[in-house]
């Protein structure tokens, strides 16, 4: 390797290591909630039999939980392992919205564990762990009608 190129590259690598940057992805701050597989994107997708519903960055259907009563997240512990909540990122401007998403309906609620969860029309958002690929909504009507996909207007899809 040419010595003149090695020095600047070495300085760049050293600066990144000392500065905490990464060429591949940003490092979360120590207090940041780690990004989950759910991502920080809310978009509108089509699900067979249901039509247009909210989906996450992976295209997985987002659901509301009827006992949440539009404002309080009541799915914790085992429930949250089965129905992972869509956690809110730390910082402004971190959530991306696809076409058809009404940004005025997006908010957050503090969960029992103190972490913020994204909401839509005051409904805390969840994914279903058994929805393995985009376009699935196998959690629709689950638990005797307590879980429903959520529409772009913010209502349950029946």
Question: Each predicted region: which residue ranges?
Answer:
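Bacterial N-terminal signal peptides
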Residues: 10-20
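Bacterial N-terminal signal peptides that target proteins for export
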Residues: 1-11
């Amino acid at each position: 390797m040419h010595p003149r190129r090695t020095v600047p590259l070495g300085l760049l690598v050293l600066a990144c290591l000392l500065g905490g940057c990464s060429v591949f992805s940003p490092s979360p701050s120590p207090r940041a909630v780690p990004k989950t597989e759910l991502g920080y994107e809310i978009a509108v997708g089509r699900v067979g039999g249901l039509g247009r519903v909210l989906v996450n960055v992976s295209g997985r259907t987002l659901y509301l939980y009827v006992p949440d009563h539009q404002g309080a997240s009541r799915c914790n512990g085992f429930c949250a392992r089965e129905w992972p909540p869509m956690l809110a990122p730390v910082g402004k401007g971190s959530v991306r919205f696809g076409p058809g998403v009404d940004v005025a309906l997006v908010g957050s609620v503090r969960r029992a564990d103190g972490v913020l969860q994204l909401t839509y029309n005051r409904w805390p958002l969840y994914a279903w762990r058994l929805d393995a690929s985009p376009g699935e909504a196998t959690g629709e009507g689950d638990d005797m009608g307590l879980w429903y996909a959520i529409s772009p207007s913010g209502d349950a899809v029946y």
